[in-house]
A protein has these predicted regions:
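Polybasic, glycine- and aromatic-enriched phosphate-binding surface used to engage nucleic acids
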Residues: 21, 46, 53-56, 163-284
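Signature of N6-adenine DNA methyltransferases within the class I
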Residues: 3-196, 268-272, 281
């Protein structure tokens, strides 16, 4: 589109970018080298956001429907830093089952390439989770100053004013944070071709393929996997897969509750997990 870029770029970019796709090594290397927002979470939609901005003219606008995890997840700080330098116009946090075959929370993001001023206000709306929608009508948006998110911890995009006030209060009164007494890690990601029905070396360990529920666990150990650099993502040390810890599902259940349970078994897991280390006695 040489004519378009001669005029500075597109007026608008819209789409539903892919997410959750497994990347080959050469694809991952390409994205890391060409996109500043990509991080330890190799979600392709991150690159689509950056690409949309690069395709726009300075006054242009883009809108995507994408997962909502980037608004607060620890692996998306680069993306939040990037998007907060652009003028965010609207964020709509959508209800369950927008995509019937995908169990994932999504939102609609509308933003422009323009640089926001100190007084710029973002319109946000959080749908009740069980609402059924077929179109987006007039909504009672909340107004949040975009620079408010520059002052939240890790620049999290909190979409409700009452939640912002609550977090501000908790910060001021000095409540202890859970991160002061525990460490949280993400499990492993790898090509399932690395699984083996038997251990081939002493670096192979049982791979958890069961289910994590609220306070209970269904352990299914069929395969083994080697804890090595062959894994696409892993903690640096194997100790995180041993001893007392809490396994956490990445997605909350439909009642907006964390799904987590205790285990002390040695096994390699994919879910998030946390280990508590504190001078205060903690019984798991």
């Amino acid at each position: 589109f040489p004519g378009v870029f001669a005029q500075g770029g597109f007026d608008a970019v819209i789409g539903n970018p892919p997410y959750g796709a497994f990347l080959a090594t050469d694809e991952e290397k390409y994205l890391v080298n060409h996109y500043e927002t990509i991080s330890s979470f190799r979600d392709v939609y991150i690159c689509f956001i950056e690409k949309a901005v690069n395709l726009l003219k300075q006054s242009g606008t883009f809108s995507y429907i994408i997962p909502s995890g980037w608004t607060g997840g620890p692996g998306y700080i680069k993306l939040r830093n990037f998007i907060l330098t652009k003028k965010i116009r609207k964020i709509l946090l959508l209800p369950f089952d927008i995509f019937s075959e995908a169990y994932i929370d999504t939102l609609v993001l509308v933003a422009s390439k323009a640089i926001p001023n100190d007084n710029h206000v973002v319109e946000t709306y959080v749908y009740p989770k069980k609402t059924k929608i077929s179109e987006i009508r007039e909504l009672a948006y909340q107004s949040i100053a975009q620079n408010t998110w520059l002052r939240t911890e890790d620049k999290k995009l909190i979409l409700k004013n009452d939640s912002i006030l609550l977090l501000t209060h908790l910060t001021q009164v000095g409540y202890s944070k859970i991160k002061n007494i525990c460490d949280m890690k993400r499990g492993v990601l790898f090509d399932k071709k690395l699984l083996s029905p038997t251990p081939l070396t002493n670096q192979y360990h049982p791979y958890f393929e069961g289910d994590v529920y609220r306070y209970s666990i269904n352990i299914r150990l069929v395969n083994w996997v080697e804890f090595s650099d062959k894994l696409r993502e892993k903690p640096k040390e194997f100790k995180w897969f041993q001893g007392d810890r809490i396994l956490l599902r990445r997605l909350v259940n439909r009642r907006q509750r964390l799904m987590g349970c205790f285990t002390d078994k040695t096994l390699i897991t994919q879910p998030f997990f946390c280990k508590f280390e504190s001078e205060i006695p903690i019984v798991l």
